[in-house]
Regions:
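Small/polar residue-rich beta-strand/coil "junction" motifs that cap repeat-based extracellular fibers
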Residues: 1-2
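Substrate/cofactor-recognition hotspot
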Residues: 5-146
Length: 146
């Protein structure tokens, strides 16, 4: 038996929290975009779960955030440097150094990597998995609003 979700009277619990599963992708992407504290917002988690339950990828989530301007609003600017700083701050927990920013900007500005692809790569990093305690979430589940 493979149970992905549990529903209680007041809250749901997502259990499909492997990196490739819907809830796993939602948790990693939400943390990269908004920060790990966003996983405590059950309404936000619910919206992201619905997106990924439709079979969408982290790259598609990033592209949606970019296309709607939500990523620029979160980053405080639409430029590549603001985007890099947002991801680094949310995943690592501190601003990126000038050297790190420059390296990542070379990939983005040179066309070697799209923003959506960089977002996916960063969201799936082991450091992001550790920052949100994905292993712990796999044991307890991720709460979401019904």
């Amino acid at each position: 038996m493979n149970v992905e979700r549990l529903r209680f009277d007041d809250v749901g619990l997502a259990l499909d929290l492997q990196v490739g599963d819907s809830a796993g992708r939602a948790a990693l992407a939400l943390s990269a975009a908004v920060g790990p504290q966003a996983l405590k917002n059950t309404q936000l988690v619910s919206a992201w779960l619905k997106f990924f339950d439709e079979g969408k990828t982290i790259t598609q989530a990033a592209q949606t955030l970019l296309d709607t301007g939500a990523m620029a609003a979160l980053a405080g600017g639409a430029d590549n440097a603001s985007f890099v700083q947002l991801l680094y701050r949310n995943v690592i927990g501190q601003p990126a150094s000038a050297a790190t920013t420059e390296i990542l900007l070379q990939y983005l500005d040179g066309g070697g990597l799209s923003r959506a692809d960089l977002f996916r790569a960063v969201a799936e990093l082991p450091v992001n998995q550790a920052r949100i305690d994905l292993v712990g979430l796999q044991k307890t589940g991720l709460e979401y609003a019904l």
